[in-house]
């Protein structure tokens, strides 16, 4: 599966991680699993997907992965140019995740 990240909500946060940190290694491990067609994390019910994701990214499915240091990775499985693609939507802290999901 192809893996791409959102420039605003994922790529900037991922690029800012310390390459030697456990968090970086965990996110890289998730990316590697996704490339091998392994679904990681828990599926988010459609009604619980934030409007922000639906409107900005046009997603109709989403998964979340709990990471060290209270971080969360949100992604969607899409079909882009005829290829199955894991679209990494957002890498966020727990507080921002709760706010985004209305908790």
Per-range role (PLM):
Residues 1-36:
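Arg/Lys-rich, positively charged N-terminal/basic patches that mediate binding to nucleic acids
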Residues 30-33, 47, 77:
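Compositionally biased, intrinsically disordered low-complexity segments
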């Amino acid at each position: 599966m192809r893996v791409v990240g959102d420039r605003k909500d994922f790529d900037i946060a991922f690029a800012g991680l310390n390459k030697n940190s456990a968090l970086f290694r965990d996110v890289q491990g998730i990316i590697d699993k996704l490339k091998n067609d392994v679904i990681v994390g828990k599926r988010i019910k459609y009604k619980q997907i934030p409007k922000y994701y639906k409107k900005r990214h046009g997603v109709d499915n989403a998964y979340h992965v709990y990471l060290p240091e209270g971080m969360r990775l949100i992604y969607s499985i899409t079909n882009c140019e005829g290829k199955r693609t894991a679209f990494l939507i957002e890498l966020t802290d727990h507080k921002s995740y709760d706010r985004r999901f209305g908790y």
